[in-house]
């Protein structure tokens, strides 16, 4: 199945894959290497703060990785890094997807810790995190947090209310030194055709 999907993506002109939101099967990484795909290898979907598991609620009991983060995050991340670091297609390590800590004072301390593990084990690759709150309301990602990330990942810039049509322009002007990547974005239209995956 993976081979067929990756070959379809290649036919569409895609040259990179984001693994989300946990370490992928090594067989997928082997295929990406074989077929010439760049890869963003991602470790976590939650840190200490749980995500809402149901619409409109963040008060229910967590059944996610946040329950195990303190006990397992260092071992889990280091295991992924040591296992995957020799895959030539990997171009970025991702330490998280839409992590609630991005809006919390002190959240950057965890970002520094996790990035540190990545840089210690593999100093050749940059570290990213997929942010979905960069210009969100009422709380947005803190610059103190994003400043600790090598490559700031932008998720769904088109949904940020008054900035919805500005996309990356405002940040490009305000943060000239910020390296960014679109980590999760819908197509602006179905230009190339529809593909059946």
List PLM regions with ranges.
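Active-site-adjacent "gating/activation" loops or surface patches in catalytic cores
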Residues: 1
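Substrate-binding/catalytic cleft of secreted carbohydrate-active enzymes
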Residues: 5-9, 16-197
């Amino acid at each position: 199945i993976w081979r067929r999907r990756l070959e379809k993506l290649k036919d569409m002109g895609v040259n990179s894959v984001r693994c989300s939101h946990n370490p992928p099967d090594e067989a997928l990484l082997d295929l990406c290497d074989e077929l010439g795909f760049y890869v963003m290898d991602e470790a976590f979907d939650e840190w200490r703060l749980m995500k809402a598991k149901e619409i409109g609620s963040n008060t229910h009991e967590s059944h996610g990785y946040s329950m195990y983060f303190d006990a397992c995050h260092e071992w889990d991340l280091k295991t992924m890094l040591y296992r995957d670091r020799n895959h030539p297609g990997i171009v970025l390590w991702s330490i998280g997807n839409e992590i609630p800590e991005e809006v919390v004072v002190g959240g950057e301390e965890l970002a520094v810790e996790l990035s540190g593990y990545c840089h210690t084990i593999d100093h050749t690759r940059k570290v990213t995190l997929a942010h979905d709150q960069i210009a969100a309301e009422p709380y947005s990602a803190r610059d103190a947090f994003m400043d600790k990330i090598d490559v700031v990942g932008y998720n769904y810039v088109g949904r940020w209310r008054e900035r919805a049509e500005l996309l990356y322009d405002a940040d490009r002007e305000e943060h000239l030194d910020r390296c960014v990547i679109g980590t999760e974005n819908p197509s602006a239209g179905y230009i190339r055709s529809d593909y059946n995956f």
